[in-house]
């Protein structure tokens, strides 16, 4: 009997049964074939089921892919949010960002998001759906930025919402370029630079802020 992967077990636990199998196949096809070539037939071939099941359970290939993106995003939030909330300094946050980036690459999350963004460029409704799924990340970063700059010289100059959006956009851009280029060395070098520079920026912030916790 073929041994199932950990990711398959996690998806099935989250969604259950046939839906889980479809989502897992949709994600695998998206990673292997790209958005443009991820059709109902390709997903069904990957998962070994009738393509009619995709439309029965999700209504469209696009909805199945969005369900996969939902699963990936929610899983990442559950995995990273506790560490993000516990980080109290810029060096800790910079190190965490580097760790998240490496895990995203290893698990193929960069490819999933990158391909969905690519699809959203030519489909405005899909684009809106993808952007909406970034909102929890923007809110999480916004809360942290607000806490970090509280009481500092930066507080009146740094709108937390705008800064959070810029940080997410920068991270997404790094992910996308790494995916397109196939070379993660430059992205990792940039993240390593962030780790080295973070202590310098930290010196400009209040030494203690109870709101950071």
Please provide the spans of the model-predicted regions.
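Helix-turn-helix
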Residues: 21, 25-63, 67
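Outer-membrane beta-barrel domain signature
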Residues: 81, 132, 137-145
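Hydrophobic alpha-helical connector segments
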Residues: 67, 78-110, 160-167
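Short, basic, alpha-helical segments at the C-terminal edge of helix-turn-helix-like DNA-binding modules
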Residues: 70-75
């Amino acid at each position: 009997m073929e041994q199932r992967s950990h990711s398959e077990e996690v998806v099935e636990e989250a969604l259950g049964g046939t839906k889980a199998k479809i989502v897992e196949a949709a994600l695998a096809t998206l990673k292997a074939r790209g958005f443009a070539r991820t059709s109902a037939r390709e997903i069904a071939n990957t998962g070994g089921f009738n393509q009619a099941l995709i439309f029965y359970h999700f209504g469209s290939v696009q909805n199945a892919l969005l369900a996969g993106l939902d699963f990936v995003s929610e899983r990442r939030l559950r995995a990273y949010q506790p560490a993000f909330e516990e980080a109290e300094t810029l060096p800790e946050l910079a190190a965490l960002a580097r760790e998240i980036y490496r895990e995203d690459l290893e698990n193929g999350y960069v490819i999933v998001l990158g391909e969905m963004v690519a699809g959203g460029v030519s489909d405005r409704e899909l684009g809106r759906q993808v952007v909406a799924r970034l909102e929890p990340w923007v809110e999480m970063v916004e809360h942290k930025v607000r806490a970090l700059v509280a009481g500092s010289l930066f507080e009146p100059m740094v709108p937390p919402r705008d800064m959070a959006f810029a940080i997410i956009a920068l991270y997404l851009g790094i992910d996308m370029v790494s995916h397109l280029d196939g070379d993660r060395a430059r992205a990792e070098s940039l993240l390593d630079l962030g780790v080295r520079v973070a202590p310098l920026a930290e010196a400009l912030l209040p030494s203690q802020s109870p709101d950071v916790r």
